[in-house]
């Protein structure tokens, strides 16, 4: 195939007079994946060479810094750990709907003299291009320092071998997972002293002997001497980089687009708008150009392909041709495609009498005994500490039960407990199911409509396969079986499927593929970047996020840890290249890339 230069997206002369800031690496997005890139480039676990000049890294984030420590988990505030259901409002306030179909039902009570639309229009952030039956209704994005890590559940399981791709061999996956777990602080002993954790584990191990019930891996640690938990987030990954003079974090700085050099096939500048800066009569004084040796886009599975589209990348063939019929080198058909999202079912139960009796009578240790001395049965019939930590348990993904389970108590944007019920008797069950990787499932971007930040409006086109629907039914049956052993349903929280997109685990929209396994044209047709997350055809542009995680397998578990693995791999590549220029040099395993091309993703 004949490719033309990047003439459609060459440097725009209108930006020529903008102030220029230079750095070695520009990271767009401040979630845990962007934080992983920053940490591994500036302070790698291995491979930093003494005497080398440390690279300069700038991180930009559209949203504001909303905590004293940049990117800290908001649930670390004691008030939310004392009143977990109040954290629901924090989650809801941190999520912004991605695509809302235009409502066509009229307001019949509107006074006749008042204006009203007579057809579909775009207002209040609605999207008239969205088919309501193909939408991920509950999908949302977070725009704040730390991204979704400021309110996530901190579940960090490794993908089962039936979920993860073979883009890396098993030894490399293990190495990357270990480093990711170290960065985010994954542990399985956080709740070892929780009474209800031990009770729920004991019940599940007795009733489901072949299911290997275990503590859910959590990116968290218990606060010494108190029944509080310190939840991990981007701030955990960044660590002391937040005080490093070589690292700069700019909040409320929005990357509007990338400018390319049509001679070198590189990103030459990123156009950044300071959203909070007052603007006087001088045009564009709130904008600057950042010139970086390497640019990393970590905006998440929707906002990353959105920025690429705004910058000139195209997925439709007719939009990518010049006047002579040559394809732009920014033509990547897979952009936005292969989108996967998990099905999700949910219920809440009130523990059975016999399990509550065990809570009341069993010897759970000195903390419980102290509580019983302080409060008699009339003061507290449950007889366990009021601040006993909530359980976090899982029945792991297997070939016969191919779904991820979280049997716990936590705050979501749904599932609050009525005040008349003792919250210590409530257990939530959340099941996450796979969806097959399908080329037809995608997110597209409008040429006409924009979001609140002037970026192309995303539109979903997503449908479950027949296999997905049947498997989700089996998943629901399994959840009902497990719930029935634990207790009876909390009224209003009976088993139910949740709105599409609520899992917030969209993957694959800029999927990776091992380079060299196919022809260049074929690789660009079915993927967006290589195993180091470098975009095809652009020498200095890397990606990060759930969007990089490829099929053909699909995941049911929380994919954050896996996305961090790709970021570690990409950072190793960038660090190695910077090392040649006198910054950092890194170690690379010769066996990192599996040369077997039968399963290259």
From Swiss-Prot:
GO terms for molecular function: flavin adenine dinucleotide binding; pyranose oxidase activity. Disulfide bonds: none annotated. Keywords: FAD, Flavoprotein, Oxidoreductase. It holds the Pfam family GMC_oxred_C. The modification Tele-8alpha-FAD histidine is found at residue 151. It comes from the Eukaryota. It is an enzyme of class 1 (oxidoreductase). One of its GO terms (biological process) is secondary metabolite biosynthetic process. Binds 1 FAD covalently per subunit. InterPro entries: FAD/NAD-bd_sf, GMC_OxRdtase_N, GMC_OxRtase_C, P2OX, P2Ox-like. It catalyses: D-glucose + O2 = 2-dehydro-D-glucose + H2O2. Residues 591-601 have a biased composition (Acidic residues). The active site is at 505 (proton acceptor), 558. Its cofactor is FAD. Substrate binds at residues 406, 408. Catalyzes the oxidation of various aldopyranoses and disaccharides on carbon-2 to the corresponding 2-keto sugars concomitant with the reduction of O(2) to H(2)O(2). Belongs to the GMC oxidoreductase family. Homotetramer. This is Pyranose 2-oxidase. It comes from Emericella nidulans (strain FGSC A4 / ATCC 38163 / CBS 112.46 / NRRL 194 / M139). The gene is p2ox.
């Amino acid at each position: 195939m004949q490719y033309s230069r990047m003439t459609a997206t060459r440097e725009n002369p209108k930006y020529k007079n903008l102030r220029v800031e230079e750095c070695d690496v520009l990271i767009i997005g401040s979630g845990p994946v962007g934080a992983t890139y920053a940490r591994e480039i500036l302070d790698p676990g291995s491979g930093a060479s003494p005497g080398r000049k440390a690279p300069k890294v700038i991180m930009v984030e559209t949203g504001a810094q909303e905590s004293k420590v940049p990117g800290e988990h908001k649930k670390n505030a004691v008030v939310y750990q004392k009143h977990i259901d109040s954290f629901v409002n924090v989650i809801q306030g941190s999520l912004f709907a991605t695509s809302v179909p235009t409502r066509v039902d009229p307001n019949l009570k509107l006074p006749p003299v008042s204006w009203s639309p007579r057809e579909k229009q775009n207002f209040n952030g609605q999207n008239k291009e969205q088919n309501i039956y193909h939408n991920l209704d509950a999908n949302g994005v977070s725009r704040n320092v730390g991204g979704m890590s400021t309110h996530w559940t901190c579940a960090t399981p490794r993908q089962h071998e039936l979920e993860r791709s073979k883009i890396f061999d098993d030894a490399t996956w293990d190495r990357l997972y270990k480093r990711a777990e170290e960065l985010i602080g994954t542990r399985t002993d956080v709740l070892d002293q929780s009474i209800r954790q031990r009770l729920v584990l004991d019940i599940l191990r007795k009733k489901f002997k072949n299911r290997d019930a275990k503590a859910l891996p959590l990116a968290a640690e218990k606060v010494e001497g108190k029944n509080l938990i310190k939840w991990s987030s981007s701030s955990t990954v960044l660590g002391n980089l937040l005080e490093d003079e070589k690292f700069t974090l700019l909040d409320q700085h929005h990357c509007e687009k990338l400018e390319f050099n049509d001679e070198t096939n590189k990103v030459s500048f990123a156009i950044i708008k300071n959203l909070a800066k007052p603007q006087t009569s001088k045009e564009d004084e709130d904008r600057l150009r950042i010139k970086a040796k390497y640019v990393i886009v970590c905006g998440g599975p929707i906002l990353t392909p959105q920025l690429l589209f705004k910058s000139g990348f195209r997925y439709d063939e007719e939009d990518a041709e010049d006047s002579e019929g040559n394809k732009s080198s920014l033509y990547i058909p897979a952009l936005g495609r292969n989108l996967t999202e998990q099905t999700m079912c949910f219920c809440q139960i009130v523990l059975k009498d016999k399990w509550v009796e065990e809570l009341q009578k069993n010897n759970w240790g000195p903390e419980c005994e102290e509580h019983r001395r302080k409060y008699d049965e009339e003061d507290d019939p449950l007889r366990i500490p009021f601040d006993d930590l909530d359980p976090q348990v899982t029945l792991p993904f297997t070939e016969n039960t191919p779904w991820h389970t979280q049997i716990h108590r936590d705050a979501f944007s749904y599932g609050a407990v009525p005040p008349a019920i003792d919250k210590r008797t409530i257990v939530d069950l959340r099941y996450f199911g796979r969806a097959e990787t399908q080329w037809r499932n995608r997110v597209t971007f409008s040429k006409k409509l924009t979001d609140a930040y002037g970026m192309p409006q995303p539109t979903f086109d997503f449908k479950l396969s027949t296999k997905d629907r049947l498997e989700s039914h089996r998943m629901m049956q399994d959840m009902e079986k497990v719930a029935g052993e634990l207790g009876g349903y909390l009224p209003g929280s009976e088993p139910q499927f949740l709105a599409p997109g609520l899992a917030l685990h969209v993957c694959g929209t800029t999927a990776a593929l091992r380079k060299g396994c196919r022809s260049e044209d074929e690789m660009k047709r079915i993927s967006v970047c290589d195993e180091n997350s470098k975009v095809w055809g652009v020498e200095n542009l890397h990606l990060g996020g759930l969007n990089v995680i490829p099929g053909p397998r699909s995941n049911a578990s929380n994919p954050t840890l896996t996305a961090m693995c790709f970021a570690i791999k990409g950072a190793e590549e960038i660090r190695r290249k910077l090392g040649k220029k006198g910054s950092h040099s890194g170690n690379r395993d010769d066996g990192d890339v599996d040369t077997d091309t039968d399963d290259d993703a």
